[in-house]
């Protein structure tokens, strides 16, 4: 249900659900993640993958693939259970929907991670994504812009 309000000499049409959400919204819950913690989370996730796959491949190709699958399984478990990757959970970060300020749904999280993987295959675009996060005031990476997400501190 929408309603009309007057503010000064302007008429504003508001959606009641948006107004209820706005009044319940606490900005302190959505503080921006630091650039360093975002970078560190990426490095931790990459290091864990590198170690699991590297140890596996040291034992043979099949074991390397199993190591990568186990890593993906852990990440999927953390994303489904906690709404965070392992590193984001350890560092107190969470991915939110940029438009609703709500924690991102599992399916959207998976899509976001797939975008990151595709960018990683083209190292140049992954570097560009990091630079985008460095120069933007809201610290959103190219992945965030494409997926409609933002990484914030998890105040829970």
Curated annotation (Swiss-Prot):
The chain crosses the membrane at residues 46-66, 114-134. Keywords: Cell membrane, Membrane, Transmembrane, Transmembrane helix. Pfam families: RDD. It is found in: Cell membrane. It is a multi-pass membrane protein. GO terms for cellular component: plasma membrane. InterPro entries: Pra-immunoreactive (IPR051791), RDD (IPR010432). PANTHER family: MEMBRANE PROTEIN, PROLINE-RICH ANTIGEN HOMOLOG-RELATED. This is Uncharacterized protein HI_1560.
């Amino acid at each position: 249900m929408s309603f009309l309000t007057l503010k000064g000499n302007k008429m504003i049409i508001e959606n009641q659900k948006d107004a209820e959400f706005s009044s319940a919204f606490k900005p302190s819950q959505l503080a921006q993640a630091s650039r360093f913690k975002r970078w560190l989370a990426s490095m931790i996730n990459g290091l864990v993958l590198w170690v699991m796959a590297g140890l596996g491949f040291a034992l043979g190709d099949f074991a390397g693939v199993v190591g990568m699958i186990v890593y993906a399984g852990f990440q999927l478990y953390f994303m489904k259970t906690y709404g965070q990757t392992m590193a984001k959970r350890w560092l107190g970060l969470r991915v939110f929907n940029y438009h609703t300020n709500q924690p991102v749904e599992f399916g959207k999280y998976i899509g976001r991670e797939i975008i990151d993987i595709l960018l990683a295959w083209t190292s140049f675009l992954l570097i560009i994504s990091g630079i985008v996060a460095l120069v933007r005031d809201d610290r959103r990476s190219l992945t965030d812009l494409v997926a409609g997400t933002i990484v914030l501190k998890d105040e829970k």
